[in-house]
């Protein structure tokens, strides 16, 4: 009987899957469900970790208690478990194998925060597509990415996993990842389902401490934290993951307003929602459920379809249904969403790992794309004419704990990266250094936190023999990511002392940072003649470093997050709101505070007495080896209506002596509205590549609907009024024009 059922289901799917019409998928799902028992249905709402006793896993599969398994990356094991599910489980429903694939599978890409610095939607999409090719080759069909939590506090370790502080940039890049993972069709063997996470507000953890309380008002959710998720819904993302945090006192995994009223009813999302690891059971420590039975009821009814690893659904739903506390209709709807995804992925038609004659893993094209993305993700923060290194350089000293740290340069969540395939900076320099140029490599610190007593005499002695000094500093991969928050963002260990020792030699010093977050680097920038921020650049980070330092590639990255002067400024971000006492920007000199003067003598502005209110480096900032000039800003239609777009033209000229790429950025702002609004917001950007001396007119389009916000009555829409338009190469300064929105 079971064999007949499996054959019937596969035949049924084969007949309808290619067209991928929603109605046909729904018909398939209903046919499958008509043959499922209650136990089968409950099993389809349960996800487990495969890194456990495989005998136990096999037994659970045979009982129909497993819908999805994560963290198995052996194709033969995946096929073996899948065969048990298809041939021996009661319903014959295939398993969906999943993995946290945040920035590359085997070939590790720059961390997402670094990718965001590229402002290159197309390249990020291509890199994500390569990731899907690698992962699906061994049977992974569901990736827990992209992560799009807006983060404005670099103390939070998971800032590394997202696209920074700006909703517009995060929206565009998250959509690029979704398109890369899912391709043109989920049923394609080369595609895998993306998962928009973490819904929502997780990046607003108080104090930057992971899993901490978040306070995000409804208006801020709509204006700041919702946009990337809504953009992914519109792009067809297959799944969502709820977050660990609460929103206005209700944990996200059990928040019906978020998971049903907003996500499904308001935005029209039809895919499935999975909890984060154990977050269904997490309602107990949150204090809103007395046990897992109550947590299961709350979360399922809220709209969380699949329970990741808390076993709350598996162990309690049958009893809840029997007692009448959970409706069978609610269970059925959750099962439909899970099965719909499996059908769309073609799992019934082709449940096993695809066979390939030639592996794409670590292939030439994949590595080249990863290298290019690492180049474009790197941000040149300072250059006193030392870079790129020229033919006059005959001896190079390379040092620092990140110069040969293959594991650490991959960054957080590089679960399947292999350091044996990772090219470090010193390896790339040694491999590519022109003949006649001598390399001196000094392993001055074993790792970034190394506090070994060292006066660096040997290092300074070696440095005096070199024409240029290159120091690779930063943080280990374990210093960022989940549960890895920091209160002190300065360089750890003896790294700053090492840089001081190098600078004392008087030789030109190039400092290259590899880190998972913005660090506090004001003093290090002063010590250095050039500063390149590479984030954690991934597998090809070493080659990218060589290419950038020697001018084989020209830096074009722009900061996707504001760099603070010190931790006391945090949170600091460019799109802050108007206040009643706006800082002038000249405040912050403690030495100028007079003695025994009236309280009001210093004025009344939103500032500090001991540090300037401005950041060390603004959002959107990044230098190049060439220079650019923007001119002739014009707005095509100075007055627009709600259905229009604001079309902007600006001339961009490469005024330097080499080819380069500039990111032209358009910001809007308004001085009056029904609610307080940000002083400026990024609304468009365009990467433009220009040869030396070349000038080009760049067109930017801002749909008026993108100017919508959460109004005073909490409705979503635009308001008529006058807008300021600023077009520049960062969030500070630029050319200014105006337009008016009429209703």
Language-model regions: role of each:
Residues 16-709, 717-731, 738:
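Glycoside hydrolase catalytic-domain context in secreted enzymes
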Residues 739-743:
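Short beta-strand edge segments in extracellular beta-sheet folds
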Residues 1-24:
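Bacterial Sec-dependent N-terminal signal peptides
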């Amino acid at each position: 009987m079971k064999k007949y059922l499996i054959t019937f289901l596969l035949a049924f799917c084969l007949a309808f899957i290619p067209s991928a019409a929603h109605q046909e998928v729904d018909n398939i799902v209903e046919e499958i469900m008509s043959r499922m028992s209650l136990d089968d249905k409950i099993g389809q709402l349960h996800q487990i970790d495969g890194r456990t006793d495989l005998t136990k896993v096999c037994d659970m599969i045979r009982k129909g208690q497993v819908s999805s398994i994560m963290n198995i990356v052996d194709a033969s094991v995946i096929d073996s478990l899948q065969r048990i599910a298809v041939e021996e489980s009661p319903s014959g429903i295939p398993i969906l194998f999943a993995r946290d694939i945040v920035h590359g599978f085997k070939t590790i890409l720059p961390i997402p925060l670094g990718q965001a610095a590229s402002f290159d939607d197309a390249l990020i999409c291509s890199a994500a597509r390569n990731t899907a090719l690698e992962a699906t080759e061994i049977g992974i069909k569901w990736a827990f990415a992209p992560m799009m939590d807006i983060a404005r506090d670099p103390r939070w370790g998971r800032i590394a996993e997202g696209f920074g502080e700006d909703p517009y940039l995060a929206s565009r890049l998250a959509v690029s990842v979704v398109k890369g993972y899912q391709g043109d069709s989920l049923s394609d063997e080369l595609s895998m389902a993306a998962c928009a996470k973490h819904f929502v507000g997780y990046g607003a953890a108080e104090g930057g401490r992971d899993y901490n309380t978040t306070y995000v008002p409804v208006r801020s959710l709509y204006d700041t934290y919702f946009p990337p998720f809504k953009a992914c819904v519109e792009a067809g993302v297959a799944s969502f993951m709820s977050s660990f945090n609460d929103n206005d006192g209700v944990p996200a995994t059990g928040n019906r307003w978020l998971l049903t009223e907003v996500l499904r009813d308001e935005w029209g999302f039809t895919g499935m929602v999975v909890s984060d690891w154990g977050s269904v059971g997490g309602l107990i420590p949150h204090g809103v459920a007395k046990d897992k039975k109550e947590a299961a009821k709350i979360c399922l009814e809220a709209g969380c379809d699949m329970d990741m690893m808390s076993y709350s659904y598996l162990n309690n739903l049958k009893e809840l249904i029997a007692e009448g506390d959970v409706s069978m209709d609610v269970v059925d709807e959750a099962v439909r969403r899970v099965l719909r995804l499996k059908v769309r992925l073609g799992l019934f038609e082709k449940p096993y790992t695809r066979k390939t004659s030639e592996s794409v893993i670590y292939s030439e094209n994949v590595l080249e794309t990863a290298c290019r993305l690492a180049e474009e993700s790197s941000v040149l923060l300072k250059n006193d004419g030392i870079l790129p290194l020229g033919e006059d350089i005959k001896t190079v000293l390379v040092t620092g704990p990140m110069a040969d740290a293959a594991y650490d340069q991959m960054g957080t969540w590089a679960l399947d990266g292999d350091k044996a395939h990772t090219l470090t900076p010193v390896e790339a320099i040694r491999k590519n250094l022109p003949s006649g140029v001598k390399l001196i490599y000094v392993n001055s610190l074993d790792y970034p936190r190394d506090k070994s007593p060292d006066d660096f005499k040997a290092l300074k002695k070696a440095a005096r023999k070199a024409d240029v000094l290159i120091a690779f500093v930063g943080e280990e991969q374990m210093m960022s990511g989940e549960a890895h928050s920091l209160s002190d963002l300065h360089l750890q260990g003896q790294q700053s002392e090492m840089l001081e020792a190098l600078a004392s030699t008087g030789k030109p010093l190039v400092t290259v940072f590899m880190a998972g977050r913005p660090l506090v680097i004001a003093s290090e920038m002063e010590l250095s003649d050039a500063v390149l921020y590479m984030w954690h650049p991934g597998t090809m980070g070493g080659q990218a470093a060589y290419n950038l330092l020697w001018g084989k590639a020209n830096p074009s990255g722009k900061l996707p997050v504001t760099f603070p002067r010190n931790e006391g400024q945090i949170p600091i971000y460019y799109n802050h709101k108007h206040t009643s006492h706006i800082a002038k920007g000249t405040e912050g000199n403690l030495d100028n505070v007079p003695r025994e003067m009236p309280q009001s003598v210093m004025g009344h502005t939103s500032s500090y007495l001991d540090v300037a209110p401005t950041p060390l480096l603004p959002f959107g900032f990044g230098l190049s080896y060439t220079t650019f000039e923007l001119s002739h800003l014009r707005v095509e239609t100075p007055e627009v209506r709600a259905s229009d777009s604001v079309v902007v033209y600006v001339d961009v000229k490469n005024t330097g002596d080499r080819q380069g790429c500039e990111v032209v950025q358009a910001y809007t702002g308004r001085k009056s509205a029904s609610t307080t609004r940000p002083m400026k917001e990024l609304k468009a950007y365009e990467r433009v590549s220009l040869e030396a001396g070349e000038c080009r007119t760049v067109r930017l389009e801002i749909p008026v609907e993108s100017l919508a916000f959460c109004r005073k009555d909490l409705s979503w829409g635009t308001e008529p009024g006058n807008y300021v338009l600023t077009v520049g190469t960062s969030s500070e300064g630029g050319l200014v024009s105006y337009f008016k929105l009429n209703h």
